[in-house]
């Protein structure tokens, strides 16, 4: 439940469309609903600006479907990250309108399509191999009510591809830059723009990349002062933070 749905609930009571007892029944599950294996946080949108997001890894299809359907019944947008097709099959039996975004490995249910962001969030990937992480950021930012554009495969091995898109970079209010290997691209982008750059190290690379650790350390030591960093492969975290920045 978010602030808008709470206002509607109170308004329905005021207009006589809903009895006080019905309203109490709907509010009973605030702040959370105990399913035994999960305590579903229905209050999170009021506190944090976005409903609880389901991390699909290590959850059974039945668990994901149960949590997803409980959130969907409260009239909010729902997102499950790191989800697979078996989990989606279980979800779509319970939630009509749920969609699976294969590249992002995300299940989405979007009821609220209002735009809350003040500008454009641009998601950049260094290579094609970084796109799944970038797409997780795209899906997250879109579901949080942002205008999102993407720019893929513009890494430093062919920096002219990036420079040819300086106009696109310049239109962004917030940038998310995903890169593996040595993780140089966020620093390059940071030197070209005057807005926040959220760097996402990916686990793409050969042995000494250490599954994204080399990129993470490189990004944390960026000389570009507008670069901040999230965890390895954490496109969701980048999309979430970019959305909060874009609302300021």
Model regions and ranges:
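Long amphipathic alpha-helical segments
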Residues: 1-84, 88-89, 94
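Short glycine/serine/threonine-rich phosphate/pyrophosphate-binding segments
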Residues: 62-64, 130-135, 159-160, 179-189, ...
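Glycine-rich oxoanion-binding loops at beta->alpha junctions
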Residues: 104-108, 147-168, 213-214, 230
